[in-house]
Amino acid sequence: MNMDIEARVKKVITSCIAVDVDSINGQTHLVEDLYADSLDLIDIVFGLSEEFDISCNENDLPDMTTFADICRVVKKSLESRV
């Protein structure tokens, strides 16, 4: 995975949820590990849309349960723009 994408995704997550950036790794689960609630998840989706200028909405949430999942969705969205 692109390290720039990972760093930017971490930035979005930590701006929406009060967690330490070092506590996030590929298998970090948003709900189980970071205790994100539904509003946090929506904030993350909209934050990703703004950060990466991609079309991302709450319909993408089922595919975005872990940090690695989020990075994959973002990367796929960025690649489809090209």
From Swiss-Prot:
* Main location per the UniProt record: cytoplasm
Q: How is it modified after translation?
A: 4'-phosphopantetheine is transferred from CoA to a specific serine of apo-IacP.
GO cellular-component term (any)? cytosol
Q: Does the keyword Phosphoprotein apply?
A: yes
BP GO terms, sorted: lipid A biosynthetic process
Identify the residues that the record assigns to the Carrier domain, covering every copy.
3-78
Tell me the residues on which O-(pantetheine 4'-phosphoryl)serine occurs: S38
Q: Which PROSITE patterns match?
A: CARRIER
Cell compartment(s), UniProt:
Cytoplasm
| GO MF term (any one) | acyl binding
Keyword set, alphabetical order: Cytoplasm, Phosphopantetheine, Phosphoprotein
Q: Name one Pfam family in it.
A: PP-binding
Protein task:
Acyl carrier protein.
Name the NCBIfam families on file: PRK08172.1
The protein's name: Probable acyl carrier protein IacP
